[in-house]
Amino acid sequence: MEQEQDTPWTQSTEHINIQKKGSGQQTQRLGRPNLTQLMDHYLRIMSQVDMHKQTVSWKQWLSLKNPTQGSLKTRVLKRWKSFNKQGWTD
């Protein structure tokens, strides 16, 4: 089997595990996270991003003063179109 080479991606995703020795000194051991850990981390981050977007959206919504049905419809359509252009790249 070929040995896996370090890339910027694998280097940036390495976890540092700190283990105590019997003498009380600490040593660091680098290890790559498995796929489950990476997916868990990704989902946690995306969930935080989604919550932030919802909060910003509601703040904008609440900041509208006496919105009419027409102005709300226009605003929602603009946001929907911009979201569709961006897709999953947010």
Curated annotation (Swiss-Prot):
Which residues are listed under the site Low pathogenicity? 66
Keyword Cell cycle carried by entry: no
HAMAP family found in the cross-reference section: INFV_PB1F2 (MF_04064)
Which parts of the sequence are annotated with region: Mitochondrial targeting sequence? 65-87
Q: Which UniProt keywords apply?
A: Apoptosis, Host cytoplasm, Host membrane, Host mitochondrion, Host mitochondrion inner membrane, Host nucleus, Host-virus interaction, Inhibition of host innate immune response by virus, Inhibition of host MAVS by virus, Inhibition of host RLR pathway by virus, Membrane, Modulation of host cell apoptosis by virus, Viral immunoevasion
* GO-annotated biological processes: symbiont-mediated perturbation of host apoptosis; symbiont-mediated suppression of host cytoplasmic pattern recognition receptor signaling pathway via inhibition of MAVS activity
Q: Read off the Pfam families from this record.
A: PB1-F2
Location of the region described as Disordered in the Swiss-Prot/TrEMBL record: 1-31
Coiled-coil ranges per UniProt: none
Q: List the disulfide bonds.
A: none
Please give the name of this protein.
Protein PB1-F2
Q: Name a GO CC annotation attached to this entry.
A: host cell mitochondrial inner membrane
Checking InterPro entries in the record gives: Flu_proapoptotic_PB1-F2
Function statement: Plays an important role in promoting lung pathology in both primary viral infection and secondary bacterial infection. Promotes alteration of mitochondrial morphology, dissipation of mitochondrial membrane potential, and cell death. Alternatively, inhibits the production of interferon in the infected cell at the level of host mitochondrial antiviral signaling MAVS. Its level of expression differs greatly depending on which cell type is infected, in a manner that is independent of the levels of expression of other viral proteins. Monocytic cells are more affected than epithelial cells.
| Similarity remark | Belongs to the influenza viruses PB1-F2 family.
Subunit structure, interactors included = Oligomer. Interacts with human SLC25A6/ANT3 and VDAC1. Interacts with host MAVS.
Where found in the cell?
A: Host mitochondrion inner membrane; Host nucleus; Host cytoplasm, Host cytosol
